Amino acid sequence: MKILIVQTNIPGQDVAVKIAEIIVEKRLAACANVLSEATSIYWWEKKLQREIEHPVVFKTTESLKDSLIKELRALHPHDVPEIVFPKLEDVEETYANLIIQETKA
């Protein structure tokens, strides 16, 4: 089974932690890391925006990708949330098995 990393940025630490908890509680990800704040600079509606956000990294399986995306879109405060999948070359077998086990309901 293929293991995926899913990354997003969420404004506000409390919001980021709550979203991460919901996704892990629903077993759409085996774990989530809410990282220290980052300043995001981007264009939105023809205006340059600057916002403090918290990067969040989820570890999941390919079979849960669509469900995780759907849940993240529903919970995320942005209309068009960043949801990216950094490419993994390989995952250590014991850790991969843990992710697979912990994403089973």
Model regions and ranges:
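Positively charged, small/polar-rich N-terminal and surface patches that mediate targeting and assembly
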Residues: 1-105
